[in-house]
Amino acid sequence: MIKQRTLKQSIKVTGVGLHSGEKVTLTLRPAMPNTGVVYYRTDLNPAVAFPADPNSVRDTMLCTALINEQGVRISTVEHLNAALAGLGIDNIIIEVDAPEIPIMDGSASPFIYLLLDAGIEEQNAAKKFIRIKQYVRVEDGDKWAEFKPYNGFRLDFTIDFDHPAIGKDVRNYEMNFSAQAFVHQISRARTFGFMKDIEYLQSQGLVLGGSLDNAIVLDDYRILNEDGLRFKDELVRHKMLDAIGDLYMAGYNIIGDFKAYKSGHGLNNKLLRAVLANQEAWEFVTFEDKAQVPQGYVAPVQVLI
């Protein structure tokens, strides 16, 4: 049987909030089988829970934010969510003493190290996957995202920015998902932004924690980071990282073929909602026999960094 996974022990880290610029403490805790991914804001009394749910994503302007019925929000969940998807963690309690998850270095890599440091253990319950059964597509102007049936999790993402530093050869990335592929090819790709947008946002009291330490920053001509890029196509890889985090907002790893053009948090969420709203388009599956599992999900609990 392919089993659900949680952490072996709790672990804590501090970082900076991207929007507030304030110190944020993040605590990750093990959870019982079938708990799912649950975010908690512990700075509120009583603490407010945000179970990962695509219908709770009500703001995708600059990040993915979960907002409850009372208007309480928790922001910038997508990079941590991507790390959970990457390692196939089904059950976890995430506590944060602020309205946002710390930005760390702008990628999912620090969260991967944190999760592996806590240790991953299997639980005595079958892991559920969402298997795509029908073609589903959503569009927004010239942007689109789609799912097709496929026995694995394949991703194909294309960006299109009219910028001299983003050539045609670095606008597309394709990958067959596995924990190993995610850790090595995707998790280190950092978020990016354009100087003119950042200056405006900071004048509005946003992205106050944004810096060259936690983002790739571009002016009108070039990349401003002294050390350059981690991959020549780091920008499109980061967009794929975002998509993996956004699509894990259902709390289950997906078996299907995902393809997107210029998609962002909003369209990724719209696609996930469209799939789940159509009961003919998907099904829950579990695997009693490891031989039946799609190749990318036959992942060992130990991932080599």
Swiss-Prot record:
Requisite cofactors: Zn(2+)
GO molecular function: metal ion binding; UDP-3-O-acyl-N-acetylglucosamine deacetylase activity
GO CC annotations on file: membrane
GO BP terms, alphabetized: lipid A biosynthetic process
Keywords carried by this UniProt record: Hydrolase, Lipid A biosynthesis, Lipid biosynthesis, Lipid metabolism, Metal-binding, Zinc
Catalytically driven reaction(s): a UDP-3-O-[(3R)-3-hydroxyacyl]-N-acetyl-alpha-D-glucosamine + H2O = a UDP-3-O-[(3R)-3-hydroxyacyl]-alpha-D-glucosamine + acetate
Pathway, per record: Glycolipid biosynthesis; lipid IV(A) biosynthesis; lipid IV(A) from (3R)-3-hydroxytetradecanoyl-[acyl-carrier-protein] and UDP-N-acetyl-alpha-D-glucosamine: step 2/6
InterPro entries reported for this sequence: Ribosomal_Su5_D2-typ_SF (IPR020568), UDP-acyl_GlcNac_deAcase (IPR004463), UDP-acyl_GlcNac_deAcase_C (IPR011334), UDP-acyl_N-AcGlcN_deAcase_N (IPR015870)
Parts forming coiled coils: none
Its EC number(s): 3.5.1.108
Active-site residues, as the UniProt record annotates them: 265
Pfam families found in the cross-reference section: LpxC
Keyword Transferase part of the UniProt annotation: no
Binding site for Zn(2+): 79, 238, 242
Enzyme class: hydrolase
Recorded family membership: Belongs to the LpxC family.
Functional description taken from the UniProt entry: Catalyzes the hydrolysis of UDP-3-O-myristoyl-N-acetylglucosamine to form UDP-3-O-myristoylglucosamine and acetate, the committed step in lipid A biosynthesis.
HAMAP family per the UniProt record, alphabetical: LpxC
Protein's name in the database: UDP-3-O-acyl-N-acetylglucosamine deacetylase
Gene: lpxC
